[in-house]
């Protein structure tokens, strides 16, 4: 459960109307992430775990936007019903010059947005760029979709898939 301080903080988050236990929990996640982001000096709203991202997305509190390449989505998989706005494309990867314009077509600048990449690195750069142009509630999903590569064989640790969160592959 949450302390009265956490509940009060959640109820004040962005002036949200917080009434149910799930609302309180969702807004507490965002408030905690934002506070940690401010303390760390992040240039975006903050970080959330894959489990927190699923909770926020499945409760329709936030948009989950996949910033990986189209090839990654096709070959590795993706979270159903998530928009795709590639941060970078090509080989070697180059920043998508239309990223901000494409993001603006998917989300309002006041929406709560969770950005997901492979390991949580590209999504940080994408979150910083979005914040710079006025997106106020942009969060990075740490560990990303696949997690961090931990050895030469490509074994990963963490990530959306490792927590058995919903995903599909075409």
Regions found by a protein language model. Name each.
Residues 66, 120:
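Conserved G/P- and acidic residue-centered "switch" motifs that form tight phosphate/ATP-binding loops
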Residues 115-116:
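Short, surface-exposed ligand- or partner-binding patches at beta-edge/loop junctions that are enriched
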Residues 2-62, 70-112, 123-170:
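Rhodanese-like catalytic fold shared by cysteine-dependent sulfurtransferases
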